[in-house]
UniProtKB/Swiss-Prot annotation:
This is Histone H2A.Z. It is found in: Nucleus; Chromosome. Its main location: nucleus. One of its GO terms (cellular component) is nucleosome. The modification N6-acetyllysine is found at K5, K11. Gene3D superfamilies: Histone, subunit A. The gene is HTZ1. Acetylated once deposited into chromatin.
């Protein structure tokens, strides 16, 4: 019998599913982990539907947020590793952000349960060092 359907058979006429288009998210197309669609939705709600938002604006903003998050998490992970613990706490985030000059100027917010950075005024340190040097000279 002629007019066979091939190996796949069915209604496709033996052509298979090679022409079926798979859907890919904006995040996957851009190679990002953060959700571009959700960021775009938040942009729309923030502007209250009055401002037009370009197609690539949400992708760009998502990439910036992902980069900043990766940077902070890397520094906080290093701080946790230095303290020999395996879990990042708000204290590690605080140490990471305040330890980096650029992140410190960018993120001026108070981090809950972050504590404070240890700091001794230079004038106090100089007096202590001068006393130690004076004691060494006399001896």
């Amino acid at each position: 019998m002629a007019g066979g359907k091939g190996k796949t058979g069915g209604k496709t006429g033996g052509k298979g599913d090679s022409h079926v288009k798979t859907t890919k998210s904006h995040s996957a197309k851009a190679g990002l982990q953060f959700p571009c669609g959700r960021i775009k939705r938040h942009l729309r709600t923030i502007t209250r539907q009055k401002t037009r938002i370009g197609a690539k604006a949400s992708i760009y903003l998502t990439a910036v947020l992902e980069y900043l998050t990766a940077e902070v998490l890397e520094l906080a992970g290093n701080a946790a590793k230095d303290l020999k613990v395996k879990r990042i706490t708000p204290r590690h985030l605080q140490l990471a952000i305040r330890g980096d000059e650029e992140l410190d100027t960018l993120i001026r917010a108070t981090i809950a349960f972050g504590g404070v950075l240890p700091h001794i005024n230079r004038a106090l340190l100089l007096k202590v060092e001068q006393k130690k040097k004076g004691a060494k000279v006399e001896a």
